[in-house]
Amino acid sequence: MAANYWASTQRKHWLFTRERLAEIRESFKEKDKASHTHFPLPDQRLLNIYFNQQLIKLGKRMSTRQQALATAQVYIKRYYTKNEIRNTNPYLVLTTAFYLACKMEECPQHIRFVVSEARALWPEFIVPDVSKVGECEFSLISEMQAQLIVHHPYRTLSELQPELSLTSDEVALAWSVINDHYLTDLSLLYPPHIIAVMAIIVAVVFKPSSQTAFHGSAAPIAGAMRDGGMNILAALSDKGGAGPPPRIQKLIAWLAESEVDIKAVIESTQELVSLYEVWEQYSEKNCKELLGRMIRSKSLDK
């Protein structure tokens, strides 16, 4: 899966502008206003958090590595740029994206095993018929035009670790930030190297204490990011300002020489801050109830 990102289908076909994503979602709403009225759903980022938590539960049951879960999240996002979520069974889409991602990331799971474990988690929404996952897999592949290779920021993070002399704590936090970016639209908006650089900046500026446990997410530093996020943005935007600490100065100097799109890095940081703000409203119970009501009312669980 180490093909060149710059020649990839991800770069050519699966990067959008914010305006284009908004147009796509608005078009879904215009086509079926009744469903949007009768079946209100939480903020997309809250749904992303819910889907991510469900994927983690499924992945843990089968000891799946993080990159396969990340690929599954990208597949789900891509699929929902082509399909209105209210016309689907999201649990089936999630299960199928997981199954397909495991194959693509070379850690395949048998379809019967995946269906069995998914049914153990969501028995009211996943039927025992494995052909349903097979049909959904065909739909996923078709909607993505068989463009299934996903380039992730994890690789860039690993490559930059020695160059930027990142500590193990900084790498762990940057990894967690990368995990969290899949809860936003960022994977549809920017190349993976932009996300990796953003994650490194966050990790260096908000260096975690040895007592901080991230458990795969950087949410524990949300408050610090909200309070200090604008200072980071100012430091990155204004190279001539009062000097930040030497560690951050070194990072800013590297950024200036690297020709990385700093505007994109800043926008990505702002998106992450926004995610952590909306996360405070997250309710797993609410997401589950609203999705369940929609699925049962529209008989999407059959």
Curated annotation (Swiss-Prot):
<dbReference type="Pfam" id="PF00134">
    <property type="entry name" value="Cyclin_N"/>
</dbReference>
<dbReference type="InterPro" id="IPR013763">
    <property type="entry name" value="Cyclin-like_dom"/>
</dbReference>
<keyword id="KW-0678">Repressor</keyword>
<dbReference type="InterPro" id="IPR006671">
    <property type="entry name" value="Cyclin_N"/>
</dbReference>
<dbReference type="GO" id="GO:0016592">
    <property type="term" value="C:mediator complex"/>
</dbReference>
<comment type="subunit">
    <text>Component of the srb8-11 complex, a regulatory module of the Mediator complex.</text>
</comment>
<keyword id="KW-0010">Activator</keyword>
<dbReference type="GO" id="GO:0005634">
    <property type="term" value="C:nucleus"/>
</dbReference>
<comment type="function">
    <text>Component of the srb8-11 complex. The srb8-11 complex is a regulatory module of the Mediator complex which is itself involved in regulation of basal and activated RNA polymerase II-dependent transcription. The srb8-11 complex may be involved in the transcriptional repression of a subset of genes regulated by Mediator. It may inhibit the association of the Mediator complex with RNA polymerase II to form the holoenzyme complex. The srb8-11 complex phosphorylates the C-terminal domain (CTD) of the largest subunit of RNA polymerase II.</text>
</comment>
<keyword id="KW-0804">Transcription</keyword>
<protein>
    <recommendedName>
        <fullName>RNA polymerase II holoenzyme cyclin-like subunit</fullName>
    </recommendedName>
</protein>
<keyword id="KW-0539">Nucleus</keyword>
<comment type="similarity">
    <text>Belongs to the cyclin family. Cyclin C subfamily.</text>
</comment>
<feature type="domain" description="Cyclin N-terminal">
    <location>
        <begin position="53"/>
        <end position="142"/>
    </location>
</feature>
<keyword id="KW-0195">Cyclin</keyword>
<dbReference type="GO" id="GO:0016538">
    <property type="term" value="F:cyclin-dependent protein serine/threonine kinase regulator activity"/>
</dbReference>
<dbReference type="InterPro" id="IPR036915">
    <property type="entry name" value="Cyclin-like_sf"/>
</dbReference>
<keyword id="KW-0805">Transcription regulation</keyword>
<dbReference type="GO" id="GO:0045944">
    <property type="term" value="P:positive regulation of transcription by RNA polymerase II"/>
</dbReference>
<dbReference type="InterPro" id="IPR043198">
    <property type="entry name" value="Cyclin/Ssn8"/>
</dbReference>
